[in-house]
């Protein structure tokens, strides 16, 4: 919970204090995860705080929207990172009896989702002045993890 919930809460809380003190509007952005709506086996310690984080994002929208402080999140899946490294990709692909390439393209669009795609989603939410409480999914299409 410390890394995947409280770090977000601490940053968001301090950011809101600054925005209120300076009487400015702004946007809080939360790095959520597919795990928040579609937990994977043996990923409880990662997924539980991410589920709480999704609700925290929405709570900030409710609590501070009237002050012009927006709160949005990105819900991404299968992005190469320090957590989803080559060893984990190989292990998860082997468990599913697919190649690593097939594992990374295992979505409706059949395309690997890259860090750049996630960065673009964060940028879009940051500049969308009329959007708050939104969770933008960036996963190439994973119906099991869909918010709808």
Annotate the PLM regions:
Residues 111-138, 143:
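C-terminal substrate-recognition "lid" of short-chain dehydrogenase/reductases
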Residues 66, 79-107, 148:
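A glycine/serine/threonine-rich, flexible loop-to-helix segment
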Residues 33:
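Residue(s) in the substrate-gating loop at a strand-loop-helix junction
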Residues 17, 62-66:
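Alpha-helical segment proximal to the catalytic Tyr-Lys
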Residues 65, 70, 130-134:
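Short, small/polar-rich loop/turn modules that mediate ligand/substrate recognition or access, typified
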Residues 39-47, 59:
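Active-site loop-to-helix junction immediately N-terminal to the catalytic Tyr of the SDR YXXXK motif
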Residues 1-10, 29, 53, 104, ...:
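Catalytic Tyr-X3-Lys loop
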Residues 12, 49, 57:
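Active-site helix of classical SDR
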């Amino acid at each position: 919970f410390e890394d995947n919930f409280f770090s977000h809460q601490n940053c968001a809380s301090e950011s809101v204090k600054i925005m209120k003190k300076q009487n400015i509007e702004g946007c809080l952005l939360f790095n959520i995860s597919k795990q928040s709506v579609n937990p994977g086996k043996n990923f409880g310690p990662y997924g539980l705080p991410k589920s709480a984080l999704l609700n925290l994002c929405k709570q900030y929208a409710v609590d501070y929207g009237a002050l012009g402080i927006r709160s949005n999140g990105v819900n991404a899946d299968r992005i190469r990172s320090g957590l989803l490294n080559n060893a984990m990709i190989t292990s998860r692909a082997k468990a599913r009896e697919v190649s690593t390439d097939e594992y990374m393209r295992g979505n409706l669009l059949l395309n690997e989702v890259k860090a750049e795609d996630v960065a673009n989603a964060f940028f879009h939410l940051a500049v969308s002045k009329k959007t708050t409480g939104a969770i933008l999914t960036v996963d190439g299409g994973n119906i099991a993890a869909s918010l709808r």
